[in-house]
């Protein structure tokens, strides 16, 4: 599934946690790291889309239920079922420019931004593992 892990609504999602901790950050950013963990090759090579080639009209806000693992939950954000976060899925476009990482080794990592509260307009970094 081609997606970005968050939409511009992410700050609203975590606002109860910020309030609980008395935190009022001027900026929130979220970065993802993608790394291969298996020893003998990637069964799902990674693909990353240049955010400058993505149009807002191609994005589909989608609720992802039960987000977060048990040990990551807080009383403020989640119960035993996790919590709901809004992600972007994307329609396909010939305008998308993709970068592929088919032969990463365990010492390589790709870092990319998935949320920035100061970014206007919000530019999601679409990504997906390629199931081949």
Regions from the language model: what does each represent?
Residues 83-132:
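Catalytic core of Fe(II)/2-oxoglutarate
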Residues 1-87, 95-96:
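Non-heme Fe(II) oxygenase catalytic core, chiefly the N-lobe of the double-stranded beta-helix
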């Amino acid at each position: 599934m081609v997606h970005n892990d968050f939409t511009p609504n992410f700050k609203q999602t975590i606002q109860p946690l910020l309030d609980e901790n008395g935190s009022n950050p001027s900026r929130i950013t979220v970065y993802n790291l993608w790394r291969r963990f298996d020893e003998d090759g990637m069964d799902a090579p990674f693909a990353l889309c240049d955010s400058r080639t993505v149009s807002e009209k191609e994005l589909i806000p989608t609720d992802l239920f039960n987000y977060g693992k048990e040990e990551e939950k807080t009383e403020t954000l989640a119960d035993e079922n996790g919590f709901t976060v809004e992600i972007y899925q994307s329609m396909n476009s010939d305008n998308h420019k993709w970068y592929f990482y088919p032969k990463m080794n365990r010492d390589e990592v790709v870092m990319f931004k998935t949320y920035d509260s100061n970014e206007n307009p919000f530019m999601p970094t679409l990504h997906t593992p390629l199931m081949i």
